[in-house]
């Protein structure tokens, strides 16, 4: 099964990706995680680092190559879930071309899931988000506060000015993506507000897999 999970920053894609991947036994491929790891390891070019820190979206060339290399690894043989890619119609076209290639064995997307969350809630989720420098665990100062002694980091792209820019950029760049997948009858819009398990149940029902994984 090949799933694409889309939604604005703060919609809960990372949480849902982990839950869905556990259900279907497929790996999560997060462009955000891959890019942040490249940033931490010092392998990300400075021009891309500057874009990330300011809350901008990276050009296609910085992302498509990562996806192409990752999706031919052995753990992707039975499918995978893409989190954060594609964001534009050109990226979606490139993904279709990649999946149809000989290296991929003529695969195709099974479903595209859009997590819908109102912008004010997205802003509140992101601005109060913190990351533990040592473990990488993500906390929320209000809803999921960190334990005492956690060494917290406020990501540059989670600061208020960067959050507004990220959401604006997402809305502008993905405006044509959802109609693209809707026309292909692949798009499933799901309310992303609620407990993680509730949202997962909505997703499974939307894609025709209610009760999947023993629920």
From Swiss-Prot:
State the coiled-coil residue ranges.
none
What Gene Ontology cellular component terms go with this record?
cytoplasm
Q: What is its EC number?
A: 2.7.4.3
Sequence segments annotated as region (NMP): 30-58
Q: Which Pfam families match?
A: ADK
Gene3D superfamilies of this UniProt entry? Answer: P-loop containing nucleotide triphosphate hydrolases (3.40.50.300)
**Could you say which residues bind AMP here?**
31, 36, 56-58, 84-87, 91, 155, 166
Question: In which residues is ATP bound?
Answer: 10-15, 129, 138-139, 194
The protein's location, in the record's own words, is: Cytoplasm
The record's section on InterPro entries has: Adenyl_kin_sub (IPR006259), Adenylat/UMP-CMP_kin (IPR000850), Adenylat_kinase_CS (IPR033690), ADK_active_lid_dom_sf (IPR036193), P-loop_NTPase (IPR027417)
Which UniProt keywords are listed? ATP-binding, Cytoplasm, Kinase, Nucleotide biosynthesis, Nucleotide-binding, Transferase
Query: Enzyme class, one word?
Result: transferase
Q: How does it assemble?
A: Monomer.
Q: Give the similarity note.
A: Belongs to the adenylate kinase family.
**UniProt function note:** Catalyzes the reversible transfer of the terminal phosphate group between ATP and AMP. Plays an important role in cellular energy homeostasis and in adenine nucleotide metabolism.
Q: What is this protein called?
A: Adenylate kinase
| Species the sequence originates in | Sorangium cellulosum (strain So ce56)
Name the gene that codes for it. adk
């Amino acid at each position: 099964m090949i799933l694409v999970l889309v939604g604005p920053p703060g919609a809960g894609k990372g949480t849902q990706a982990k839950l869905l991947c556990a259900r279907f036994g497929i790996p999560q491929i997060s462009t955000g995680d891959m890019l942040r790891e490249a940033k931490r390891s010092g392998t990300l070019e400075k021009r891309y680092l500057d874009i990330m820190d300011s809350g901008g979206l990276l050009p296609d060339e910085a992302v498509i190559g990562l996806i192409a290399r990752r999706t031919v690894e052995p753990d992707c043989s039975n499918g995978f879930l893409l989190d954060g890619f594609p964001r534009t119609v050109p990226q979606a076209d490139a993904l279709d071309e990649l999946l149809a290639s000989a290296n991929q064995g003529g695969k195709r997307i099974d479903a595209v899931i859009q997590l819908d969350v109102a912008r004010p809630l997205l802003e509140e989720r992101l601005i109060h988000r913190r990351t533990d420098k040592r473990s990488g665990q993500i906390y929320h100062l209000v809803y999921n506060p960190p334990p005492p002694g956690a060494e917290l980091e406020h990501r540059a792209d989670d600061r208020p000015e960067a959050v507004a820019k990220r959401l604006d950029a997402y809305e502008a760049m993905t405006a044509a993506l959802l109609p693209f997948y809707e026309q292909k009858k692949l798009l499933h819009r799901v309310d992303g507000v609620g407990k993680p398990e509730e949202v997962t149940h909505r997703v499974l029902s939307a894609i025709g897999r209610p009760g999947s994984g023993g629920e």
